[in-house]
């Protein structure tokens, strides 16, 4: 089956973290994981126990997927034997867990081309021109790549990354600045509360007086408004003013129909992230409502050698839980082993008792009296 994508995106960016440089000879590998979220990271672990080294691709420039993008500091309560952890802590622990297997990460790029070869392996090329020939592919891309929903004001995009931001990477960058924060969800409220008292001024704007955020955060924001520590306006941004290429004001039309001009140094917009399945939709996989259909024995797709785990897959009884994705990753690893070691019989071993697994993990085998 030909799985090529028309008009693949590629440039001459040199890849320095493994794989081939753009336009170079593809690297031959055993397993390629698409998605560096928690399930993708645990897929590295399960493959590693079977002595299968993995390469991992993610469209984001950081590891962790939506756990890190959407709720790095939010508590997670349903990871077995971990009563509470944040998205960032979960990611950090998974990275620690997979250290013995030395996975190679290729971040800030998407899979642009997948072609089935006559020998059963797959040719893969990313949007940065990194190339592989791989025996297996594991799609652990959550609900796809995340792109921020942007502010729909003509021409304002030219300030993107300069004075217009959809993510906060370095909070200190906004200290002492006049900020306008737009949005009504947790991210907008969280950053508003964090930056009040650190920024020169903070004005929060939302199109209505209702919020999709924690009630305690909303109450705290209103308390700060009463204390004159910040302002809140109901309205929508419809325009802006600039001087010498610098954003100086935004125009906000309120519920009363009056347009107000607000001075601004930086504009932070939190409209949420829009999941996009992206090129995966063109791979020839069986899809159901933008999710990939799999069997429940190996979590393999309709294309032999391509597996799907985590929120991106669907099957009867599917539950979108991190722990479900971990289970799927374990079975997918065993399902993939025959493609990688066709002559090898895979025996079930346990990390508690197997000297072989202890050696793989780099730990001492316990001595029992």
Swiss-Prot record:
Required cofactor(s): FAD
Catalytic activity: 2 reduced [2Fe-2S]-[ferredoxin] + NADP(+) + H(+) = 2 oxidized [2Fe-2S]-[ferredoxin] + NADPH
Any one GO molecular function term: flavin adenine dinucleotide binding
Enzyme Commission designation: 1.18.1.2
Residues where FAD binds: 58, 66, 71, 111, 146, 311, 352
Keyword tags: FAD, Flavoprotein, NADP, Oxidoreductase
InterPro entries per the UniProt record, alphabetical: FAD/NAD-bd_sf (IPR036188), FAD/NAD-binding_dom (IPR023753), Fd--NADP_Rdtase_type_2 (IPR022890), Ferredoxin-NADP_redctase_2 (IPR050097)
Coiled coil start-end: none
Enzyme class: oxidoreductase
Record text on cofactor binding: Binds 1 FAD per subunit.
Region annotation Disordered: where it falls in the sequence: 1-23
Oligomeric form and interacting partners: Homodimer.
Family statement: Belongs to the ferredoxin--NADP reductase type 2 family.
PANTHER family, per the entry: THIOREDOXIN REDUCTASE 1-RELATED-RELATED
UniProt name for this protein: Ferredoxin--NADP reductase 2
Gene source species: Cupriavidus necator (strain ATCC 17699 / DSM 428 / KCTC 22496 / NCIMB 10442 / H16 / Stanier 337)
């Amino acid at each position: 089956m030909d799985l090529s994508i028309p008009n693949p995106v590629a440039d001459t960016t040199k890849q320095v973290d493994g794989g081939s440089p753009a336009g170079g000879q593809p690297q031959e590998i055993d397993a390629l994981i698409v998605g560096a979220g928690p399930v993708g990271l645990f897929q590295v672990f399960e493959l590693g126990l079977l002595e299968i080294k993995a390469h991992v691709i993610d469209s984001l420039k950081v590891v962790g997927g939506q756990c890190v993008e959407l709720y790095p500091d939010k508590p997670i309560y349903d990871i077995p034997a971990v009563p509470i952890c944040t998205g960032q802590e979960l990611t950090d622990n998974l990275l620690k867990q997979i250290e013995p297997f030395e996975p190679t990460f290729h971040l800030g790029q998407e899979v642009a081309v997948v072609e089935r070869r006559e020998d059963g392996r797959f040719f893969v090329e990313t949007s940065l021109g990194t190339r592989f020939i791989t025996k297996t592919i594991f799609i652990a891309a959550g609900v796809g790549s995340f792109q921020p929903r942007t502010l729909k004001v003509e021409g304002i995009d030219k300030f993107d990354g300069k004075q217009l931001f959809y993510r906060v990477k370095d909070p200190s960058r906004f200290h002492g600045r006049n900020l306008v924060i737009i949005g009504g969800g947790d991210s907008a409220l969280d950053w508003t509360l964090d930056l009040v008292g650190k920024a020169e001024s903070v004005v929060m704007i939302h199109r209505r007086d209702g919020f999709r955020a924690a009630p305690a955060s909303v109450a705290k924001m209103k308390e700060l408004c009463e204390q004159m520590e910040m302002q809140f306006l109901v309205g929508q941004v419809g325009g802006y003013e600039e001087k010498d290429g610098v954003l100086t004001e935004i125009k906000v039309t309120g519920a009363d129909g009056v347009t107000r001009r607000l001075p601004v140094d930086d504009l932070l917009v939190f409209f949420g992230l829009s999941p996009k399945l992206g090129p995966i939709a063109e791979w020839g996989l069986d899809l159901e409502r933008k999710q990939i259909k799999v069997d429940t024995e190996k979590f393999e797709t309709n294309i032999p050698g391509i597996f799907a785990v985590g929120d991106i897959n669907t099957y009867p009884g599917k539950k979108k839980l991190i722990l479900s994705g971990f289970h799927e990753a374990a079975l997918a690893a065993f399902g993939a082993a025959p493609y990688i070691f066709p002559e090898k019989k895979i025996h079930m071993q346990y990390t508690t008792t197997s000297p072989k697994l202890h050696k793989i993990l780099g730990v001492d085998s316990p001595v029992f009296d």
